[in-house]
């Protein structure tokens, strides 16, 4: 299927605007015929001694009329064709962004940020140029060439016209071969640009780590290698691009030589006039643009085709986590029950035989060593992944029976790697609901024990925190992320190791606030520091994806297992730190 067929949905969507633009292009092509025709008549009148002042003024009027008409119509087709093409860019970017929001974490492990950015910028820009400059070139070149050739054929000399177009088949063959090479080269240059984008994004994000290890020289060398590869790929593409215009001009020059040779002989024989020859050469000059446009069109079409293939491949990726065909309505918080027989991530068994339940309003603590499966339990509840064997039930229904947006609307999630936007503290906290009053924001920050930190800043809640909260400490980032979740007062609050960068005293105050404000709400806390879950109604100890201990804090201490030993060890460490202070 050709790229034009693939974009036909857009041309149908904007058919009225494109139709107006094409009509304007046709009229410009017709008006373009007037100046050479007028010139030929004036030259013949001068050589025949028949030119009067009235005829001269009338011909000048025709020229001015044609010039003003073309000026206005060129403005129209630019607005209606080139202007409309930007609409395609807008639609495709929206499609891509919507697609990104629906994809599972596995998708983002396959595609890197820089690669996705390249699709949303360079590839879509190539499509925009095709829908604008490409359509304009195709229509304008076709109409101009057709109208001009017909005029040359029937109003001047069909013999000269046939001679003039003799080089065209050879040009078409050469252009086709060059187009195929351009297609391949542009695909490689776009892939190289994606890699460069990835490298820049990764290098800038990790600049602190690079400096701390004194790795600047090696990182610069690595970047220069990627940069050089991108340069070479772009240079190869430009090499083929640069061949188009000289090649077209070579064939156009051949047409001029043949026309002058045959035309001069015909003038000598009296078959045509000097004015006819001048008009014919002027028309031939007008054919230069259509011939050049063929090269431009081949170039821009190949680029658009490559970019559309890349975008199409991206949009064809489907998330393994989907909404049910017949979703349940009216989701409500209630009894949460895990009944997981097994779950594998990337073909590796992650969770096995996970069975427990949590009543509405209770708190669940998940503890265990790193990699024990705590976060996997959270991801399954959020439906970032789906259970292989078994199910998770909420209020008696499999969570897969609810729409994703409905399920997640019940939850406030604070992940291990919290993400903050490069805006103000106020905007970050109100991210879930920008219309919340300042009083609600202040209350949420007090619950998360970050209020005083904020008011001590010169700009207070209007402080711009930089990309990913770069101006804040680790503990401040965690507490801001908690404020963002807590301000929504979710039915299910999930804190995934969200207190790791907070000191023990602040942690105790936050936990105390949670106990007070979330008596009728479900709370799930994963932690390495066991003091964060001592108040939980149910604590699960995970090891290698299995539950090895369960119960309340007192129950687990009585078991004298992993939990009790770890808790006692951590308490001794905390006491030692306090004594040292």
Sequence positions of predicted segments:
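A short amphipathic helical element positioned immediately N-terminal to and/or at the very start
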Residues: 1-15, 116
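An intracellular "coupling" helix at the cytosolic face of ABC transporter transmembrane type-1 domains
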Residues: 15, 105-106, 122-131, 135, ...
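Transmembrane helix-loop-helix hairpins at lipid-water interfaces of multipass membrane proteins
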Residues: 18-73, 154-159, 271-274
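Hydrophobic alpha-helical transmembrane segments of ABC transporter permease domains
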Residues: 23, 34, 121-166, 251-255, ...
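Short intracellular "coupling" helices and adjacent cytoplasmic loop segments at the cytosolic face
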Residues: 86, 94-118, 122-124, 198-222, ...
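Small-residue-enriched core segments of transmembrane alpha-helices in multipass membrane transport
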Residues: 163-178, 279-288
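Cytosolic ends of transmembrane helices, especially the final helix of ABC transmembrane type-1 domains
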Residues: 215, 239, 286-314
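ABC-type nucleotide-binding domain
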Residues: 331-581
